Amino acid sequence: MGAQFSKTAAKGEATAERPGEAAVASSPSKANGQENGHVKVNGDASPAAAEPGAKEELQANGSAPAADKEEPASGSAATPAAAEKDEAAAATEPGAGAADKEAAEAEPAEPSSPAAEAEGASASSTSSPKAEDGAAPSPSSETPKKKKKRFSFKKSFKLSGFSFKKSKKESGEGAEAEGATAEGAKDEAAAAAGGEGAAAPGEQAGGAGAEGAAGGEPREAEAAEPEQPEQPEQPAAEEPQAEEQSEAAGEKAEEPAPGATAGDASSAAGPEQEAPAATDEAAASAAPAASPEPQPECSPEAPPAPTAE
């Protein structure tokens, strides 16, 4: 029992000599497995760290014990010791110290904020012309883009319009050309019909001789006459030479052509002697196409047709 008391007494002396260590030993930091010496190195934020003894022992530079020795010597030395104690408290409480540091940094930042604002304003004022210069070309760069888009759109629209107009012009020209060809064909058909009409009185004048030479009936010749203008009108619309295609027989296609031209010339000049020959040839060519009966009669008409020319 005496040994135990001695141990407890020794412990009490130790606690009296080093209350900070006893407080640290009784601190719940041991639950983490940290010893007293480790607390100095790690600087663990324990509730005992707030005590002045712990603060003094936690100093690693040894300024705290020196301050304790020099307390009766001078009060001025206590001020740096207090400052160091404050630093030790900040070190022991890293979270609070960080918050204090942030607050301290924020405090000088606040007075410097007007200066920063002034500097920012001056920088903005100095950079404002540059920014304005940079902003000035930016709208100019945007406007040409818009102009380019507009011009491109207008160009495309104009091109489409021109192409559409060109197509209209081309279609109009094609229609005019077709109309001109149709008018020319109509004129040729009218001229051919006029020549045949002019040749009709010639046929009436010399119809007896022509019918006697052909040996055909007058009714067949009269029926062939209305068929003649129909045949030349159709080929006239297709080709300029309507009279050459009006004849059904391919062998006699070349022979009546000069006769037809002679008939046109006779209608223009006025001689009635050549007109009966051309009309006889046309009637002879149209007769076989109109009815199959006069086909054998066409054979004797073939030799006198060139002789009449």
UniProtKB/Swiss-Prot annotation:
Q: Which residues carry this modification: N6-acetyllysine?
A: 165
| Skewed-composition ranges (Pro residues) | 291-309
Q: How is it modified after translation?
A: Acetylated at Lys-165 by KAT5; acetylation is required for its subsequent phosphorylation. Deacetylated by SIRT2.
One Gene Ontology biological process: actin crosslink formation
Phenotype of the disrupted gene, per the record: Most of deletion mutant embryos display an abnormal brain development with defects including open cranial neural tubes (exencephaly), open spinal neural tubes (spina bifida) and tail flexion, and the pups die within several hours after birth.
**Induction of the gene:** By lipopolysaccharides (LPS).
Query: Could you tell me which residues belong to the region Disordered?
Result: 1-309
Instruction: Please give the subunit comment from the record.
Output: Interacts with CDC42. Interacts with GTP-bound form of RAB10. Interacts with calmodulin/CALM1.
UniProt-recorded name of the protein? Myristoylated alanine-rich C-kinase substrate
Lineage here is: Eukaryota, Metazoa, Chordata, Craniata, Vertebrata
What gene is it encoded by? Marcks
